[in-house]
Amino acid sequence: MKLGILSDTHNNIDVVRRALDLLRDSGVSHVVHAGDITSPKMLSLFTGFTARFVLGNGDIDSEALNEESRRLGFGPIGESCVFEEEGKSIIVFHGNNVPMFREAVASGKYHYVIKGHTHLFENYTAGTSRVINPGALYGADEFTVAILDTETGKVERILVEAE
């Protein structure tokens, strides 16, 4: 399965629309957002995807985000999200909680550790986990998202045009 990975969208609606179009065109139907959504109105852009979200340090109104996420059928948004795809365990969190990151990697429980926060693309192995940061769609020199193929383990960095 191809899993689309986004983070740090910071309410940049036009760029997020372009990113989601690119993911859709690449055959992605499942996405995760690693935090800093910032506005509940962003969530409606993800309609048509199976989507999971986590809160970032910029998601000040977590109550409104959760209310909208539930209304749209995505479910609750917490500090982290753990799930499994094709036998691979995945944890998603924003990345500003460094002890949580270290614990996730040190535990050896996760095939994939997905985070955001730094606005920089990352794809590396730490212990037994692959760490993926898709970059950002706001506040970065280049706007990027990622696609993880859970069957092959391939991670693709996708550049999203600003305009």
Range-by-range predicted roles:
Residues 25, 77-86, 108-109, 125-127, ...:
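Binuclear metal-dependent phosphoesterase catalytic core
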Residues 71, 110-112:
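Structural recognition of alpha->loop->beta junctions
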Residues 52-95:
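Helix-adjacent hinge/juxtasegments
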Residues 11-25, 92-107:
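Pre-active-site segment of Zn-dependent metallo-hydrolases
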